[in-house]
Amino acid sequence: MSFMGLPLAGQKHCPKSGQMEAMVMTCSLCHQDLPGMGSHLLSCQHLLRKDCFQGLIQELGQIAKAHETVADELISCPGCERVYLTRDVTEHFFLHCVPTEQPKMARNCSECKEKRAAHILCTYCNRWLCSSCTEEHRHSPVPGGPFFPRAQKGSPGVNGGPGDFTLYCPLHTQEVLKLFCETCDMLTCHSCLVVEHKEHRCRHVEEVLQNQRMLLEGVTTQVAHKKSSLQTSAKQIEDRIFEVKHQHRKVENQIKMAKMVLMNELNKQANGLIEELEGITNERKRKLEQQLQSIMVLNRQFEHVQNFINWAVCSKTSVPFLFSKELIVFQMQRLLETSCNTDPGSPWSIRFTWEPNFWTKQLASLGCITTEGGQMSRADAPAYGGLQGSSPFYQSHQSPVAQQEALSHPSHKFQSPAVCSSSVCCSHCSPVSPSLKGQVPPPSIHPAHSFRQPPEMVPQQLGSLQCSALLPREKELACSPHPPKLLQPWLETQPPVEQESTSQRLGQQLTSQPVCIVPPQDVQQGAHAQPTLQTPSIQVQFGHHQKLKLSHFQQQPQQQLPPPPPPLPHPPPPLPPPPQQPHPPLPPSQHLASSQHESPPGPACSQNMDIMHHKFELEEMQKDLELLLQAQQPSLQLSQTKSPQHLQQTIVGQINYIVRQPAPVQSQSQEETLQATDEPPASQGSKPALPLDKNTAAALPQASGEETPLSVPPVDSTIQHSSPNVVRKHSTSLSIMGFSNTLEMELSSTRLERPLEPQIQSVSNLTAGAPQAVPSLLSAPPKMVSSLTSVQNQAMPSLTTSHLQTVPSLVHSTFQSMPNLISDSPQAMASLASDHPQAGPSLMSGHTQAVPSLATCPLQSIPPVSDMQPETGSSSSSGRTSGSLCPRDGADPSLENALCKMESEDSTRFTDLLGQGPIVPGLDAPKDLAIPSELEEPINLSVKKPPLAPVVSTSTALQQYQNPKECENFEQGALELDAKENQSIRAFNSEHKIPYVRLERLKICAASSGEMPVFKLKPQKNDQDGSFLLIIECGTESSSMSIKVSQDRLSEATQAPGLEGRKVTVTSLAGQRPPEVEGTSPEEHRLIPRTPGAKKGPPAPIENEDFCAVCLNGGELLCCDRCPKVFHLSCHVPALLSFPGGEWVCTLCRSLTQPEMEYDCENACYNQPGMRASPGLSMYDQKKCEKLVLSLCCNNLSLPFHEPVSPLARHYYQIIKRPMDLSIIRRKLQKKDPAHYTTPEEVVSDVRLMFWNCAKFNYPDSEVAEAGRCLEVFFEGWLKEIYPEKRFAQPRQEDSDSEEVSSESGCSTPQGFPWPPYMQEGIQPKRRRRHMENERAKRMSFRLANSISQV
């Protein structure tokens, strides 16, 4: 440390000075604070505690004693590790000067007795003086000392601060060391001055201190200058480091660009070879296919004649045989004389030949790195590429003199085999050293190495000598261990006389080019060795003795020349080129190829080839995945309501379908995902929650013994009732949940445009039976919420929300427009409308089937849980109803019902749900109660099935009353539901269903007035007759209706264990009764809304969808007149040949027993009356199977199963031996197909095989496996509905593992040879793996467009 760093008495302590003081006050060895006394100061100005200093001395003494040496009194500083003599270590007196507290800023005068405040410091005597004492202060000689004035005498520190320090003389203990002897260079006192230093030069300590400070300031200034210069140097070095990093990145980019140039050239060459290979193989295959086709034609004629002769010989009629024997013999003779080329030719092989050793050696000598400037020595320049000690190579040829001259003045150049051929070969390469540009090569001493070309081609050749062209071509030749001949096969051979002039012209053109130096040892070696190069080529070998070398360009034959000595001026003239040149000239990228032998690659080459092979496979896999995504993009078009996360998971599922990777767990936040909340008993097995396509309105079927016939007259006379008026439809979203296996299946929300009528119809068309009509309730105001509830025994859900009220379902029930109403699986479709997403239960009916409509409204008057009184009963009423208002008894667990949920948006009219029934007065909805509802997510209901005692279930309705009395009144009367009981109910299971409610998010859209409708249910004045008043309030408008429950039917239903019907009677406030509907008994009454100004309205027409129900794409679509689905002609099953005229219904809506129309398809020609029935499915089974397959194709989850798995997925076909998909099934449904189905069991077997393959290949938690399970459950439900009387065997595992013996598309002869198809369309070209540049550009733009649209 320096004295300038010490704090002065009058200065404030800045933070920096405080840090320095902290450093000064710390021991360098133990890093502890120094005490006030006993510290030591080293020459390097590091400090040591007294104990630490003595410890170092003792340690040095022990070391010296151990080595039997004498300690030379040296000490090593622990801070800077410098060695000093121990005698140079002094005591740190500065610690005595350091004040223990902050020095005072105010000073007192040292002269006056009043101790006034001092203002001036006398620099001569270093005393503070006040203003008055300053005038009297003088410096005059005193008798006490001749060397210093009187004013400087006296005891110091009289007025000093606490930081003053006095040092006494060791000889005169009373004297203070205030003098400094410059002669002896030591402090002394006044007595010592008189005795020992009398003749010496002595000065006062303060004066000496001032002089020393001036000297130290000068030294400090020099140190500061030196420090600034060092900082400048450090900054320059940092800039150099940054420049080195920048140059590194720049050169690295240049190397990468060179790599890309090489890769592009290699890709072009490889593409050319592949094109050539395709041309060769296609021509060969075309000839063989023509030969095979002719053999097949002749074989069919032989079979026909042979079959006819066998039939004629075996027949009992001999006269026709004898009559036509001449014709038969003539035909046989003609066939025997027919000649056919059956010679397949000699064995044909094709292979790809190339020189891996040569190319890997050339790649190992790729480029070099040069530097300019600097003073880097040769030893400091590292060698790269394993060429240490070798001379740098330049791309040209020089004489040995030029080589020695170039080697004697080497530039700073790292070892590498090649350099770019021009000063700036491309925009990414750095320029070559200017010293290399001035070197002019003399004429080559090896004329064979010169370029043989006409003068007009010299500039073009020089222009092509760039880095991108030389790296894979001439540069490798110039850099090979033995300098080969630089062949130019694309040039004509010149006479030897012209070679020298050509070389001279070339040397003149290469004046501005960097020359290539070949080492002398390499030149000498090159004089005795002539390497043989072989470029990639394709050889087609016919037989064992024929070889044909094919290439895009003409190649010169290999020249076998003896190695000429170096002094020879000219080599022997080369052989003339072949006379025939059918191919274009060879570009510079080609060299002379050797067709005699192929040297095996070395270990390094094999390793490099393996790495290149793996990289190529990875790139191919990436391209295959991109092609797959591009090919499957049209099938992945989802609704705009889908989130990007859902789109990404869909694409990931498609990729996982190919590469067999487990997909991530589906997000729980998805609105389409419905999870099973409870597990079924162990006897049923665990079945996960499965989403189901919403386009299907089919429920899971029951057992065949669960049919419930209804004694209702047919409605053939009332089917055709249509209305010309167009009314906006109800957009609904339907989802299905089957209780038979405790599976919850929710419909995806991709298509929300679904009218209510086709959904009801599709639900009813799932079962087989005679057309029937179901009596039900007339619809209430369609703008209000309707909710159907399930029937459970001794189980009432907790309705804990006080601001919700469930409204009875008021649904119109004339199911007369449905031609096939089958009572196989009674179902209930119900939902609860609520403005709160977490409240409001909605229970399902065990035997009822109805179609509710959802709306949103604040519901009121929900009784507390304590007011809910469960009802027990032993009777069972299993009739079908259209609405239920109170849950009565437990649902029959044997009925295995399914819940259909619908969400309604922009609800308008709800009259005549099927659109074709008779018009009943009072069915229309008031316009003043319009409630648009946009419910994208319906309330999901599921059933928990604990093992309980079997209980007979009945149809009940939701209880909505304030006290038990109201509930009891309602149980005794209200709602006369007249429906015939199910006479074939099977034995009850040992389980009991307990309903529970799980609510999901509801998007509630308020009315135009901003208020939601309010529903209130109040008992009327006379509580004994069971009359209730339903009030609907929406803003300032209100409507009311009266509901009356009869008591006689209620008592019968609760007492009689037999199966009897219940009747519902609802009358209006005015006491009007609607006319009876044809086909119903007088006891069956309908619910009529009492609304002012209600008018009869026409039924709502069907609005069709905008996209095909199968492929989800647009275009020219065919609309069904009974459901909203639309189809392409080729997507429908069966595929149609033309657009029909007039009314048209799809396969899903067409009746199986009495089809409304016949399709114009290819199968129609086989169903002509006069044509013999072809072997295969019957017409009835054909329609059933087509309906099955179309239902699968219309399911959104079936998208991965529409087409076969891509052949790019190699592992799939290694695992799955018998692939199956819907396209194969649809093709085999066509009667023209040779593998046409003969029985429905074959169709079901193929469908189940498809699901089996999906489950076998994909991981269980992947999306495709989940979709396969959902689709399988959906298919089994349809199968039981369409074939309730059949039981199909499950596929065995060996069916999927074993390969098929015979071809699907071919016919097998008695000998077992699978002949290919007769027609030419059976020969399909293999899908190409390679794509051209424009196709890759299109794919890239398509992928970018898709990525932007998803963002």
UniProtKB/Swiss-Prot annotation:
Region named Disordered: 542-608, 663-730, 857-895, 1067-1098, 1289-1351
List the SUPFAM superfamilies: B-box zinc-binding domain, Bromodomain, FYVE/PHD zinc finger
Regions of biased composition (Low complexity) lie at: 872-884
Q: Which residues form the Bromo domain?
A: 1176-1282
Query: Where do the coiled-coil regions begin and end?
Result: 234-304
Q: Where is this motif: PxVxL motif?
A: 995-999
GO cellular component, as recorded: chromatin; nucleus
The family database entries (PROSITE patterns) matched by this protein are listed as: BROMODOMAIN_2, ZF_BBOX, ZF_PHD_1, ZF_PHD_2
Q: Self-association or partners: how does it assemble?
A: Can form homodimers and heterodimers. Interacts with CBX5, CBX1 and CBX3 via PxVxL motif.
Q: Under what name is this protein listed?
A: Tripartite motif-containing protein 66
Q: What is the lineage of its organism?
A: Eukaryota, Metazoa, Chordata, Craniata, Vertebrata
